[in-house]
């Protein structure tokens, strides 16, 4: 079977848009034309997106509305700080108590968010170990 990758070149906020990005009001580039092209293709479709918060936004950049199987993202740094019994505290682009800081979400499409190896605004991680994700695709699961 065919596996198709869509790597999105999403705009990053520059310094003047930094506050808007932190507040979750930054306007990302419209990705609909890229998803329209992806819709024309068959097989298992993987979307590579830096920003997990675009998976289920209420705006036009709600990636989960499109026809694909898996989105791989990072950016959230696992919530930077994780408090026991509470969870992730802060994530760039999502603010306090982010929904998509780490882990797996949804069925189809499915989102996998890696905590990654780096840091965000704070050069410290608390109860939040760096990680590299390994994803196994099984042919009989998507034929």
Segments from the language model and where they lie:
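Short, Asp-centered acidic motifs that coordinate Mg2+ and/or phosphate
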Residues: 3, 44-46, 69-70, 104
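Conserved beta-sheet core of the metallophosphoesterase superfamily
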Residues: 52-133, 142
């Amino acid at each position: 079977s065919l596996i198709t990758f869509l790597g999105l070149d999403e705009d990053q906020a520059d310094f003047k848009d930094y506050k808007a990005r932190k507040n979750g009001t930054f306007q990302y580039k419209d990705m609909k034309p890229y998803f329209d092209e992806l819709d024309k293709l068959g097989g298992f479709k993987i979307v590579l997106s830096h920003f997990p918060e675009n998976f289920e936004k209420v705006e036009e950049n709600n990636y989960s509305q499109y026809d694909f199987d898996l989105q791989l993202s990072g950016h959230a740094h696992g919530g930077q700080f994780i408090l026991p019994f509470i969870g992730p505290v802060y994530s760039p682009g999502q603010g306090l108590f982010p929904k998509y800081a780490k882990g797996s979400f949804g069925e189809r499409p499915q989102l996998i968010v890696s905590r990654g190896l780096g840091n965000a605004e704070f050069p410290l991680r608390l109860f939040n170990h760096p990680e590299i994700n390994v994803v196994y695709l099984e042919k009989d699961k998507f034929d």
